Each structure stands twice: as structure tokens, then as C-alpha cells.
């Protein structure tokens, strides 16, 4: 009897699409269904039909339901086995559409996820509060998450406390029924309540992010703290960069100023200046006066803590300069000094040459051949005796020599001086004219014998005036004295003004002019043997 009933129900559903089934009518007794089927066969058009008002075994109770059309409809009672038949697909589709429209399945899934993840002590008030929070968001499309994604989204919601909401009410089909991750047992239990739609399987999973509104400041301090940390780190980075740059600049300045004073960067030099200013106007003059004191190879460098100022030491060269470069620089300095001296000597007007200047010049020339200077020049094979470098040069004693001024009287031909007073006292007085002069010294001058012969001629002239006896005796005595003192005169070195040779052929006007010219350079001194004035050189 069941197979005719199923075929009849399918026909009724096909002919009357507006016919609705309700769940209570599915539990009508079989006899009521049979009675309704019998009455439906005998019914005519336009007559009202009676139906059972409630499910039950008695077939007598009926209710009249107007169908809204010309013919009344009879609702057949379905058995409890109606879900096994093809007719059950229609209400199932309707229920599925209702659940999808109102998001019932995702709502229960979200509730179960919250219960599982948060596990409150009182689950019913917790669910009520959650549903009340959902009540104000009817325009918002709810999305469900499971697992860690749901926990993350819910933590974001709890932090925002409902301040950030999505007020966009348009449909977003790409976010409906997002694809779920692999479900746990609890998720499977929840999903059995409402199976997901087949369309949701192909949709990608989306994660709910709250909308950012620039007008409202978020209550969460996490972003502000992170931004503050980033700003502080940037400030610290800039400060460290500036500090490192300033340290590098100060290190460069210290290297420039302390390069010659640092014991680590101090180069090895052979000599050292003592008591010499660093910015000396004439460094070579100080070098001549104070030669460098050489160091031995075993001497160790003194520390800079000894208190010696850097101005008192030799200006150090950088460490990369070798000994050869120092030697070349020293030679250049010497060559510049020599060229400067030669330039000054050329352009200087009538330099006065004295014995002290010659002595100093000789000392300076000897200083260049000293062992210390040769060591500074880079000579390694040195002979301590020094005879190798001073051959052919006279040795000058350290003590100063006595200066002797010699004058020759033109009348008595006697030398005038402190060491020759005894000889001049023995000379004979001879009368002469005071206009004639004699040179201060002969000094190995070529033509000294001619000068002596001229003196002999003068004595002959004088003898004609005084007498033959006196003249012969005076001339012979004076010639004898000249021959004895000739050797001593040649050995003497006197540096004075140029002398004036006597002449017996000059007239008195010429002699007066020469006397006037020489008076500026010579000094008149009385002769010790005769009353003749002798011109002595200054």
C-alpha cells in the first residue's frame, strides 16, 4: 500500500506547486491518510473538504482549510518514512536556503568555536552576550573562522570593543561561506547540524580584518608602542651615526696633531735637535751653531712623558719616509742655504771681511765634514780618527791667537810693534821728510825686493844732503836690518786695509793728495826711533 501512496504524492506535488507540507502532518496515522485519499477521490469541484485538525489515530476529527481557489485541497498525511522518498528533496532544499540566507550554520559554528577556544565558566551567559553583540550587526555579513584564525579574529574584535565596524552593506559573494581549514572533531560535530552548501567549497578562505579609519584613534596601544619603539630606534641610530662620525673626525685631527708626538707612530731618526725652535726663521743657522747629536743604535726611545716639548726636538717625518728621503731633504736644505748665501754675497754692497768672519766660515766648513754630519748625510762607513776627511786642511787651535799690528817707519825703516820694541830702539835717527809713507806690511807681496831697492835709492839721495859718511853708514845699517827681518815679514798674515807704496818720482801735489785720501783710512802714530809719524792701519 505504500507504493501507490508514494506515486500519488508525487503526482500531487507535480500538479499543485503551491501545495505546502508541514512537519506535523507527516505524523498522521495511516488510517487518516487512507480516509483522506478516499474522500479525495469522491470530491467534486467547488465543495469544501474536511481535514484532520491534529495528528492522531482517530479519523473522525477533521478541519476545513480553504485553499484560496475554486476547489478545496486535501492535505494527505505522510508517514514517518517520508524522508526516504524523492519527495523529501523539496523541504530539504527550502531549509537549506533558509539556513544559508540567515547564516545559521556559520553562526552556530562560530558559537561552538568560541566555546571551544575560550571555554567560559558560564557558557550560556557567554553565548547570550555574544548573540546580543551580533544583534546590532544585522547589516554586516558575518564570516566564520575556525581554529587559530578564529581566535585571532576574535581577539581583534575584543580589543576593538566594537568601535571599528564595517558599514558597507553591499553583498560580497567572494566572502560568503569561506573555505574552512581542516576541521577538528568539535568542528565536525558542529558542521553536522547544517551541512555547508556545495558552492562554498570553491570559494577561497578569507580572514576578517577590521577596517581602518583614520578619523578614529584606535584604543589599542600596540601600534603606538611599536611606532614609538621604531622612532626611538631611529633616533638612537642617528645619534650613534653622529657619534661615530664625530669620533672619526676627532681621530683624524688627533692623528694630524699627535702623529709626531705619539710613541707608537714616532719614526726612527738618527739625530735630534736640542734647544731649537720648531718654527725657526733660519733653521740652517741653528744647525750650524748646534749640530745634531747622533743616537746610537742601541739607544731606546724616551717616552713623551719626560716633559720635553715637541718644539725642542727635530720635526719628525712620517714613518713611511725612509732614510734616503731624509738624506735627500737634508741635502736640499744645505743646497738652499748655500745658494741663499751666494745670492746675498752677490747683492750685498762691499761686505766687510774681518778675521772673525773668516774663522766662523772655516768652522762651518769643517762642520760639514764632521762625523756627526756625515752620519746625518747617510754615510755608514765612518773612520773615527777623522784624518781621512781632513787631509790638506790646516788645524785651527781652539784658543784665539794674539793679534799683532806691525808698522814700518819710512825714515828709520824700523818695525813698530809691541814685540819688536827692542829692535826699534837700536835703530839710528835719520832725518827724512815726513811726507813719504811705507806700507804696513809686505806680506809676501811680489816685488818686495824692488821696494827695498827704492828705499836704498832714497837713502842715497838723503846721503847727498847730509854727507857721504853719515849716509853710507845709515844705508848699510838699514839694509842689514831689512835683510834680517825679511823672512819674518813674509811669514806674517795681516788682514788690513790696502797699503800705499812709496814713490820717489811723485810730485808734492800728488803726495799731498794721496796723504789726504789715506788719512781717512790710516792713523798717525809717532815713531819710537825717530820723530817721524807712521800711518798705522786700523
UniProtKB/Swiss-Prot annotation:
Q: Name the residues that span the membrane.
A: none
Q: Where is this region: Disordered?
A: 20-71, 151-211, 288-331, 458-482
Q: Which SUPFAM superfamilies match?
A: Dimerization-anchoring domain of cAMP-dependent PK regulatory subunit (SSF47391)
The organism sits in which domain of life? Answer: Eukaryota
In what ranges is there compositional bias, type Basic and acidic residues?
Answer: 154-171
Q: Tell me which Pfam families the record gives.
A: DUF5586 (PF17824)
**Could you tell me what this protein is called?**
Uncharacterized protein C8orf34
Q: Which gene encodes it?
A: C8orf34
Amino acid at each position: 500500500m505504500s507504493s501507490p501512496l508514494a506515486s500519488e504524492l508525487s503526482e500531487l506535488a507535480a500538479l499543485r506547486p503551491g501545495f505546502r507540507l508541514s512537519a506535523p502532518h507527516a505524523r498522521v496515522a495511516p488510517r487518516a491518510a487512507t480516509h483522506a485519499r478516499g474522500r479525495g477521490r469522491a470530491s467534486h469541484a467547488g465543495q469544501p473538504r474536511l481535514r484532520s485538525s491534529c495528528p492522531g489515530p482517530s479519523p473522525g476529527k477533521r478541519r476545513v482549510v480553504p485553499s484560496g481557489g475554486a476547489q478545496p485541497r486535501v492535505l494527505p498525511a505522510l508517514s514517518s518514512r517520508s524522508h526516504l522518498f524523492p519527495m523529501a528533496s523539496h523541504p530539504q532544499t527550502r531549509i537549506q536556503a533558509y539556513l544559508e540566507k540567515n547564516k545559521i550554520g556559520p553562526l552556530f559554528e562560530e558559537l561552538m568555536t568560541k566555546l571551544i577556544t575560550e571555554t567560559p565558566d558560564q557558557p550560556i551567559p557567554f553565548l547570550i552576550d555574544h548573540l546580543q553583540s551580533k544583534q546590532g550587526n544585522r547589516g554586516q555579513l558575518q564570516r566564520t573562522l575556525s581554529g587559530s584564525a578564529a581566535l585571532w579574529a576574535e581577539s581583534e574584535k575584543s580589543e576593538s570593543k566594537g568601535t571599528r565596524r564595517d558599514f558597507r552593506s553591499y553583498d560580497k559573494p567572494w566572502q560568503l561561506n569561506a573555505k574552512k581549514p581542516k576541521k577538528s572533531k568539535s568542528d565536525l560535530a558542529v558542521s553536522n547540524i547544517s551541512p555547508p552548501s556545495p558552492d562554498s567549497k570553491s570559494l577561497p578562505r578569507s580572514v576578517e580584518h577590521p577596517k581602518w579609519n583614520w578619523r578614529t584613534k584606535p584604543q589599542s596601544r600596540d601600534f603606538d608602542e611599536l611606532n614609538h619603539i621604531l622612532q626611538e630606534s631611529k633616533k638612537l641610530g642617528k645619534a650613534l651615526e653622529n657619534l661615530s662620525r664625530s669620533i672619526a673626525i676627532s681621530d683624524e685631527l688627533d692623528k694630524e696633531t699627535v702623529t709626531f708626538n705619539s710613541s707608537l707612530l714616532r719614526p726612527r731618526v738618527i739625530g735630534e735637535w736640542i734647544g731649537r725652535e720648531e718654527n725657526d726663521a733660519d733653521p740652517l743657522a741653528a744647525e750650524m751653531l748646534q749640530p745634531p747629536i747622533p743616537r746610537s743604535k742601541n739607544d731606546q726611545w724616551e717616552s713623551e712623558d719626560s716633559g720635553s716639548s715637541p718644539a725642542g726636538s727635530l720635526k719628525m717625518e712620517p714613518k713611511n719616509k725612509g732614510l734616503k728621503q731624509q738624506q735627500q731633504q737634508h741635502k736640499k736644505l744645505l743646497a738652499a742655504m748655500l745658494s741663499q748665501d751666494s745670492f746675498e754675497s752677490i747683492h750685498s754692497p762691499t761686505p766687510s771681511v774681518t778675521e772673525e768672519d773668516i774663522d766662523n766660515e772655516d768652522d762651518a766648513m769643517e762642520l760639514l765634514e764632521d762625523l756627526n754630519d756625515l752620519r746625518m748625510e747617510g754615510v755608514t762607513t765612518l773612520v773615527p780618527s777623522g784624518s781621512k776627511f781632513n787631509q790638506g786642511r790646516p788645524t785651527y787651535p781652539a784658543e784665539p791667537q794674539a793679534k799683532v799690528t806691525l808698522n814700518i817707519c819710512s825714515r828709520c825703516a824700523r818695525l813698530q810693534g809691541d814685540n819688536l820694541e827692542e829692535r826699534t830702539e837700536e835703530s839710528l835717527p835719520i832725518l827724512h821728510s815726513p811726507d813719504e809713507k811705507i806700507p804696513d806690511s809686505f806680506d809676501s807681496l811680489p816685488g818686495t825686493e824692488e821696494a827695498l831697492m827704492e828705499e836704498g835709492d832714497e837713502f842715497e839721495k838723503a846721503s847727498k844732503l847730509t854727507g857721504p859718511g853719515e849716509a853710507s853708514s845709515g844705508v848699510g845699517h838699514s839694509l842689514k836690518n831689512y835683510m834680517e827681518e825679511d823672512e819674518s815679514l813674509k811669514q806674517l798674515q795681516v788682514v788690513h786695509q790696502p797699503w800705499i807704496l812709496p814713490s820717489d818720482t811723485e810730485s808734492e801735489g800728488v803726495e799731498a793728495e794721496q796723504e789726504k785720501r789715506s788719512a781717512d783710512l790710516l792713523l798717525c802714530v809717532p815713531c819710537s826711533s825717530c820723530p817721524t809719524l807712521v800711518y798705522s792701519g786700523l
